[in-house]
């Protein structure tokens, strides 16, 4: 017996605003059922001595230490601005 129905597939497609045909719904139902069957096989694995992880790969931060440094002087930055006003970049208005 299938663990997921064609109606459920059509409902999810409708929620995602996807237009699918009856043939596609049947195909997706079979594919999703196969995925669920495979996932259920994972429940049979003995994980007693396996430590819990949040990632498959050993994840660690490889970034450098964040060290604040002084930025460029305002005058030097603004000399590249096509337009400025009161020490700020002036950009075209986008709201009325």
From Swiss-Prot:
Catalytic activity: L-glutamyl-tRNA(Gln) + L-glutamine + ATP + H2O = L-glutaminyl-tRNA(Gln) + L-glutamate + ADP + phosphate + H(+); L-aspartyl-tRNA(Asn) + L-glutamine + ATP + H2O = L-asparaginyl-tRNA(Asn) + L-glutamate + ADP + phosphate + 2 H(+)
Keywords assigned: ATP-binding, Ligase, Nucleotide-binding, Protein biosynthesis
Membrane-spanning residues: none
SUPFAM superfamilies reported for this sequence: Glu-tRNAGln amidotransferase C subunit (SSF141000)
Top-level taxon of origin: Bacteria
Coiled-coil annotated residue ranges, if any: none
Molecular-function GO terms, alphabetical: asparaginyl-tRNA synthase (glutamine-hydrolyzing) activity; ATP binding; glutaminyl-tRNA synthase (glutamine-hydrolyzing) activity
Record-linked InterPro entries: Asp/Glu-ADT_sf_sub_c, GatC
Gene3D superfamilies in the cross-refs: Glu-tRNAGln amidotransferase C subunit, N-terminal domain
EC number of this enzyme: 6.3.5.-
A Pfam family per the record: GatC
GO annotation (BP), single: translation
Top-level enzyme category: ligase
UniProt keyword Nucleotide-binding present: yes
Main function: Allows the formation of correctly charged Asn-tRNA(Asn) or Gln-tRNA(Gln) through the transamidation of misacylated Asp-tRNA(Asn) or Glu-tRNA(Gln) in organisms which lack either or both of asparaginyl-tRNA or glutaminyl-tRNA synthetases. The reaction takes place in the presence of glutamine and ATP through an activated phospho-Asp-tRNA(Asn) or phospho-Glu-tRNA(Gln).
PANTHER family for the chain: GLUTAMYL-TRNA(GLN) AMIDOTRANSFERASE SUBUNIT C, MITOCHONDRIAL
Quaternary organization: Heterotrimer of A, B and C subunits.
Family statement drawn from the similarity comment of this UniProt entry: Belongs to the GatC family.
Protein name: Aspartyl/glutamyl-tRNA(Asn/Gln) amidotransferase subunit C
Species for this entry: Geobacillus kaustophilus (strain HTA426)
Gene this protein is translated from: gatC
């Amino acid at each position: 017996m299938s663990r997921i129905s064609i109606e459920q597939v059509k409902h999810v497609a409708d929620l995602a605003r996807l237009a699918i045909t009856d043939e596609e719904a049947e195909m997706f139902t079979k594919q999703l059922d196969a995925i669920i069957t495979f996932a259920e096989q994972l429940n049979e694995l003995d994980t007693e001595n396996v430590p819990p992880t949040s990632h498959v790969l050993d994840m660690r931060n490889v970034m450098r230490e964040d060290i604040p440094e002084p930025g460029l002087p305002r005058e030097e930055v603004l000399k590249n601005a096509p337009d400025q006003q009161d020490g700020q970049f002036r950009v075209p208005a986008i709201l009325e």
